A protein has these predicted regions:
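A short beta-strand element within beta-rich, extracytoplasmic domains
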Residues: 114-128, 180
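Beta-sandwich interaction modules
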Residues: 100, 108-115, 150-196
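Beta-strand signatures of extracellular beta-sandwich domains
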Residues: 52-54, 133-137
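Small/polar beta-strand repeat architecture
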Residues: 15-49, 54-100, 184-185
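Short Trp-Ser/Thr-centered turn/loop motifs at beta-strand boundaries
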Residues: 5, 10-13, 97-114, 139, ...
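Conserved Ser/Thr-centered positions that define the repeating blades of beta-propeller domains
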Residues: 137-143
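Short, intrinsically disordered N-terminal pre-domain segments
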Residues: 1-21, 189-196
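Extended, low-complexity, turn-rich repeat/linker tracts enriched in Gly/Pro/Ser/Thr and Asp/Glu
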Residues: 61, 124-133, 183-188
Length: 196
């Protein structure tokens, strides 16, 4: 029987920026929240779990964050630490979609496989911007947090806007692996497939 590939990403595109004067940040008991009172943050064509957003226009939270939970159409939690900061109702805050991480997939270390051989295939559209990158990340943690992930050498794909398919082999007894797309300003990742 032929081995089947695990789909890490299936057709994920760059999203337009979200700007609002009602966006605030809250840090409470280790839960870090970005929320709005009327600006829609999630839903069709908006933010989802795994999206990377760069925040600008704030006093204390101009940084990149990973969406970890969608609470409602007006609220998300993020993996990274935010500083509590209320909106003032007049200052525009922008959430710029700059990439995404895939769900985690079991690596060879999960199954205690001795060879650790993995193959990944990336497929993007020709409109995928030239400085965007896709790379694989691994972890040895059984229940990883955002800080447990590290880049796997030799797996980075950078588009030249003409190459739309690329693959990489990598070796390691990673318990979990995932893909990470960064610096995305245009285009679509059609698919990322993994064989372990």
């Amino acid at each position: 029987m032929a081995q089947t590939s695990t789909t890490l990403i299936s057709s994920k595109s760059h999203l337009t920026s979200i700007t609002g004067t009602d966006i605030s940040f809250t840090a409470t008991s280790g839960i870090f929240t970005i929320k709005a009172t009327s600006t829609t943050l999630t839903g069709s064509g908006k933010l989802a779990v795994g999206d990377l957003i760069t925040v600008t226009g704030t006093t204390s939270n101009n940084s990149t964050f990973t969406v970890s939970t969608v609470v409602s159409t007006l609220e998300v939690t993020v993996s990274e630490v935010v500083t509590s900061e209320n909106s003032d109702g007049s200052t525009s805050v922008t959430l710029d979609h700059v990439g995404f991480v895939s769900d985690k997939a079991k690596g060879d270390g999960y199954y205690s496989q001795p060879d650790g051989v993995h193959t990944v295939a990336y497929q993007v559209t020709t409109s995928f911007n030239a400085n965007a990158t896709i790379k694989m990340q691994g972890t040895l943690a059984t229940t990883p947090t955002e800080d447990d992930w590290f880049d796997i050498p030799g797996t980075t794909f950078t588009s030249d806007t003409s190459t739309v398919t690329s693959s990489a082999n990598f070796t390691g007894n990673y318990v979990w692996v995932r893909s990470k797309t960064q610096l995305l300003t245009a285009g679509t990742v059609n698919s990322i497939l993994l064989n372990s």
